[in-house]
Curated annotation (Swiss-Prot):
Record keywords, A-Z: Chromosome, DNA-binding, Nucleosome core, Nucleus
Cell location: Nucleus; Chromosome
Annotated source species: Eimeria tenella (Coccidian parasite)
Disulfide feature: none
GO MF, one annotated term: structural constituent of chromatin
Assembly and oligomerization: The nucleosome is a histone octamer containing two molecules each of H2A, H2B, H3 and H4 assembled in one H3-H4 heterotetramer and two H2A-H2B heterodimers. The octamer wraps approximately 147 bp of DNA.
Principal cellular location given in the protein's record: nucleus
Stated role: Core component of nucleosome. Nucleosomes wrap and compact DNA into chromatin, limiting DNA accessibility to the cellular machineries which require DNA as a template. Histones thereby play a central role in transcription regulation, DNA repair, DNA replication and chromosomal stability. DNA accessibility is regulated via a complex set of post-translational modifications of histones, also called histone code, and nucleosome remodeling.
Protein name in UniProt: Histone H4
Keyword Nucleotide-binding: no
Region (Disordered): 1-20
Ranges annotated as DNA-binding: 17-21
GO cellular component: nucleosome; nucleus
Entry's family note: Belongs to the histone H4 family.
Length: 103
């Protein structure tokens, strides 16, 4: 093993990536029809055109808060993988208890 720790053969520990995809405007991946479907599931009949950007902004803030908390739980447990329970605990901490995913 030659002192590489838990990582095994050291695969995936290479240098800097030459071509790294720049992540921006991913929130636009939440398409207008997807937002419309979610609204329909919630019982909405008609949707104003100004709603879509507003929903994207609110959703982005909500997910950032959940992910930030989840990563905090993961780092505290000295893990590198975010588990479903990290998400459940993050949601519970923010007052949105989710059932059906263990715990």
């Amino acid at each position: 093993m030659s002192g590489r720790g838990k990582g095994g053969k050291g695969l995936g520990k290479g240098g800097a990536k030459r071509h790294r995809k720049v992540l921006r405007d991913n929130i636009q991946g939440i398409t207008k029809p997807a937002i419309r479907r979610l609204a329909r599931r919630g019982g909405v009949k008609r949707i104003s055109g100004l709603i879509y950007e507003e929903i994207r902004g609110v959703l982005k803030v909500f997910l950032e808060n959940i992910i930030k908390d989840s990563v905090t739980y993961t780092e505290h447990a000295r893990r590198k993988t975010v588990t479903a329970m990290d998400i459940v605990y993050s949601l519970k901490r923010q007052g949105r208890t989710l059932y059906g995913f263990g715990g």
